[in-house]
């Protein structure tokens, strides 16, 4: 086990630089304060995380200053769960066993920058761009079973296939379930803000123009298998009843928004100002989930595959037909959401040595539109 931190810094009268890093495998996410696991709380299993960061700051103490930061985070997770339970209320399947194994990993980059320019006493210009890049992977294997009696009275390995067959011969088995999944996520987010402020001579009179914008591009994939066998239900063919679901999902999601704002402040008395502001914002989100259903394939088709990160081809190579032939329109989903917001504010501000008063009114007309295609139904 290890937990290491490091920091280095450089300063002069105009420029500051600080670099820091953290690496550990004791479930510490690298944030100060609170218990291990940071403000996100304790995490299960074995977790290793790494973090590198760089902060920069420049100020010429006259008209120009800027600061920026870049941060990289990496994490690996390994969590195994074993559960044995007894239900004192159920009349059937009152004993249960479950084991699951989950592996996760993620990489993320976060960059932020702020520039402020004051060419003279009347102007102030600010620019703030941001960028975030994230990739994450996961794979999970779960096995569970339900019994009519305590399986540990008969075996030490109640989830072993041979032992399940023996327990079934004794009439103790109710059902078994095996499921696997692999997931992948990729996200890119860009944002920016530009603000221009101009003083208009008289003390306290000024006008501010501001533009904000964000763009978010996400893509996720998942492949999941589920096999359930009911030992006490008879199928149409006279054997044990079974259920299976084999599905592959791809979900690209895009969203963007922008806002325009103008604010005017007028002094009407000593340390008393009347402020008028107008803001317009537009946002758009689009999600297009495509689901491919392979549940008609024979049971256990994918049973010999061990899930690994992004191992889509291990599953898709076993298909008998092109992937497009398995597209399920009912399980797929397409949606769009648009939002238009206007905001008008009129505010009175009073500043005194011992107290401050802000009072105002706001009107916010809003219009939204939503469209969806899901389960064969179009909603608009």
What would you call each of these model-derived segments?
Residues 1-2, 14-380:
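Primarily recognizes Gram-negative and organellar outer-membrane beta-barrels
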